[in-house]
Amino acid sequence: MNNLILIAAPGAGKGTLSNDLLEKYDYVHISTGDLLREQVAKGDDLGKKIHEFQVAGKLVPSEIVYEALEKKLSDKACDNGYILDGFPRNIEQAEEYERILERSGRELGIVIVLDIPKEDLIKRITGRFTCKDCGEIHNIYSEELKPVKEGVCNKCGGELTQRKDDNLESFEVRYQTYLESTAPLIDYYKEKGVLHVIDSSQGHDYTLEQAEKLISN
């Protein structure tokens, strides 16, 4: 059984790796967004509290997010392992998460950091295009993913589009947020002896292979 935390800057491939691991190991995927939506759908007291904040257009307080997470971890489906997506985002959340684990009788597991140079991240973000029809992802800076014909999907011939926030300005904002809030978690988990760094600039296949080795150890 493994509980995983994935730490990565925007564009490092965290989402792709997470999806592949979920498919292979039948882990539970836990993201704060899905967690809150799931709780609202249940319609219990906690779900009603969350809904009130959402309707008012306010951020859901951390204490309520923690409560929802603790409820989720009590689910037997998590016994086989789970991947935390987008949490914790800072030291405060990491410390509270460990208190939740202690109360839930679960282990911290392993923390995987996807390491990649900033210039490579920029190319991954600004060069990324997605097919409107089949969802296939292309990248104009990648020999493997580059569209043969400009603006046309290699897989189905559909039109390629780019997300509005896949630009340098948006990337810099997200990257700075990562450096200020999330990156300090690297030293935090390194001191706890649970941190593992993968050079994800080597490509997705290499990244997945290394992650699988960590899980099997």
Predicted regions and their residues:
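Glycine-rich phosphate-binding loop of ATP-dependent small-molecule kinases
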Residues: M1-N217
